C-alpha cells in the first residue's frame, strides 16, 4: 500500500486539499467518492484526471465510490459555465448513465476485496425527496450569504443565474451528507472547478452532525499553451469507441507535444516515479522517437479499449505515418485493409466520375468539398506544396490525368500533409 497524498503530489495531481486529510488517510482505510454528471453518453479525456484520482485512491488501499448524477444531471452543474445548460430528457439521462458505468469499470476494481469499488446513482436518494423536506433538512443549514460567496456563483450573477442552478451546490452537498451517513464516506474528490460544491458538502455535514469531512481536487488539465486539454479539431475525445475510434484516441495521445507529454505521463499512467524519470531521460536523448507519447497512448488505449484495438491503432499509424510504401498497400489483404482503415474518413464517388475526371482537380472536386478540401484552389496549393499523395504516390501536377489503380478494386488512399488521411470509395 502506498501513500496516496505523496503519490499525487509528485504526479502534480493536487490543486486543493482540506486540512487533516493526510493524517486521516494514515489512520484508517477511508471511503471517498467522485460524482460524474451523465450529460453525454460517454466520458471524455477531460474526465480522466478525476478517474485516475479514484484509481490511485483504490491502489492506496482505500475504498472508491463513483456516483453517477442521475438526479443532479437533470439540472447541470453551473460551476464556471457562462450559460445555463440545456436539460436532457429522462430517457437520455438513463442511457448516458448506463454507458458511463461501463466505462468506469475499465479503471476500477469491482471484485470482492475489502476496498472494492462501488457504483451508485444519486437518483436513488433524490427521487422521493420532496421539496419541503429538502428545505427543512438541507436549506435551513446553509445560508444565502455562504452560497453567494462561491466564486462559481459570483461569476454568473452579472449575467443572471437561475434558482435551479444556484441550488445545485445544495444538491451536491446533500450527496456528500447522504453518503457520509449511509456509506461512511469521509472524502469527496473532483476537478479544481468543483471546490465550491465540495466544501458545501463539508459544511452541511459539519452543521448537521458536528463531524469532520474532507475534500481534495485535482488541477484542470490544460496544454502547455494554456488552452483546454481533451479536444481535437473535431471536438471532444470520447472514451466510447463509437464516438471516438480507438485509432483517433491513440493518435490524440501520440500527437501531444513533448512539454505536455512530460506532465501527462505522470497523470494518466500508473508507472512509478523511477520508471517515468527513466522514460523522460530517454525521451530527452531522442525526442524524435516520441517515447513518452507512445507510452501514454499504449497504456490508455489498452485500458479504455483493448490490447487488440491498441495493436490495430499502432499498425494503422505505422502504415499511414511511418515509412510504408505503395507496395506495402498492395500487399494488404482485404481483411487487414478494412481493419486498418476503418477509422479513416471516407468519401464516395462513382466509377464514371473517376474515369471521366480529366485531371486531379476534377477528381478531388467530384468528392464534394468540405471533407478533404474546401476548394479547387486549396487542392492546387496542396499539390504545388508537395503535400498531396494518392496511394502513397506524390501528386506533382494538378492537371495530370488520374490514371490510378484502385486498392482492393475500390479504394484510393489520399494523404494531405503529414496527418490527414482519407479514403475515396469508388462504386
Swiss-Prot record:
Its main location: cytoplasm. ATP binds at residue 231. Signal peptide: none annotated. Residues 358-426 form the S4 RNA-binding domain. The keyword Nucleotide-binding applies. It catalyses: tRNA(Tyr) + L-tyrosine + ATP = L-tyrosyl-tRNA(Tyr) + AMP + diphosphate + H(+). A motif ('HIGH' region) lies at residues 38-47. Coiled coil: none annotated. Homodimer. PANTHER family: TYROSINE--TRNA LIGASE, MITOCHONDRIAL (PTHR11766:SF0), TYROSYL-TRNA SYNTHETASE (PTHR11766). This is Tyrosine--tRNA ligase.
Amino acid at each position: 500500500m502506498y501513500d496516496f497524498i505523496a503519490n499525487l503530489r509528485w504526479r502534480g495531481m493536487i490543486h486543493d486539499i482540506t486540512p487533516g486529510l493526510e493524517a486521516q488517510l494514515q489512520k484508517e482505510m477511508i471511503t471517498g467518492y467522485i460524482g460524474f454528471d451523465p450529460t453525454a453518453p460517454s466520458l471524455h479525456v477531460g474526465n480522466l484526471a478525476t478517474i485516475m484520482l479514484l484509481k490511485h485512491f483504490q491502489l492506496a488501499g482505500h475504498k472508491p465510490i463513483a456516483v453517477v448524477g442521475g438526479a443532479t444531471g437533470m439540472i447541470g452543474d453551473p460551476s464556471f459555465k457562462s450559460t445555463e445548460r440545456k436539460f436532457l430528457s429522462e430517457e437520455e439521462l438513463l442511457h448516458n448513465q448506463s454507458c458511463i458505468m461501463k466505462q468506469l469499470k475499465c479503471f476500477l476494481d469491482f471484485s470482492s476485496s475489502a476496498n472494492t469499488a462501488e457504483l451508485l446513482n444519486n437518483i436513488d436518494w433524490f427521487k422521493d425527496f420532496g421539496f419541503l423536506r429538502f428545505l427543512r433538512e438541507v436549506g435551513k443549514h446553509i445560508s444565502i450569504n455562504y452560497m453567494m460567496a462561491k466564486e462559481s456563483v459570483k461569476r454568473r450573477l452579472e449575467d443572471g443565474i437561475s434558482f435551479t442552478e444556484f441550488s445545485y451546490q445544495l444538491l451536491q452537498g446533500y450527496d456528500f451528507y447522504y453518503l457520509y451517513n449511509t456509506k461512511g464516506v469521509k472524502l469527496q474528490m473532483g476537478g479544481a472547478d468543483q471546490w465550491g460544491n465540495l466544501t458545501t458538502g463539508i459544511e452541511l455535514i459539519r452543521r448537521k452532525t458536528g463531524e469532520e469531512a474532507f475534500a481534495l481536487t485535482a488541477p484542470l488539465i490544460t496544454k502547455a499553451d494554456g488552452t483546454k486539454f481533451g479536444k481535437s479539431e473535431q471536438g471532444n475525445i470520447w472514451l466510447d469507441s463509437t464516438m471516438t475510434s480507438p485509432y483517433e484516441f491513440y493518435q490524440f495521445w501520440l500527437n501531444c507535444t513533448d512539454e505536455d507529454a512530460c506532465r501527462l505521463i505522470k497523470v494518466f499512467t500508473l508507472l512509478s516515479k523511477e520508471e517515468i524519470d527513466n522514460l523522460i531521460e530517454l525521451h530527452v536523448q531522442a525526442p524524435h522517437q516520441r517515447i513518452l507519447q507512445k507510452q501514454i497512448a499504449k497504456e490508455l488505449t489498452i485500458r479504455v479499449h483493448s490490447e487488440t484495438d491498441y495493436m490495430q491503432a499502432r499498425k494503422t499509424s505505422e502504415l499511414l505515418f511511418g515509412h510504408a510504401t505503395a507496395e506495402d498497400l498492395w500487399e494488404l489483404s482485404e481483411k487487414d485493409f478494412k481493419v486498418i482503415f476503418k477509422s479513416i474518413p471516407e468519401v464516395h464517388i462513382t466509377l464514371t466520375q473517376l474515369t471521366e475526371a480529366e485531371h486531379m482537380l476534377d477528381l478531388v472536386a467530384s468528392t464534394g468539398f468540405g471533407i478533404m478540401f474546401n476548394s479547387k484552389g486549396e487542392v492546387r496549393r496542396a499539390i504545388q506544396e508537395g503535400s498531396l499523395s494518392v496511394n502513397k504516390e506524390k501528386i506533382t501536377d494538378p492537371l495530370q490525368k488520374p490514371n490510378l489503380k484502385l486498392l482492393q478494386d475500390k479504394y484510393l488512399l489520399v494523404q494531405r500533409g503529414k496527418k490527414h488521411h482519407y479514403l475515396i470509395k469508388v462504386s
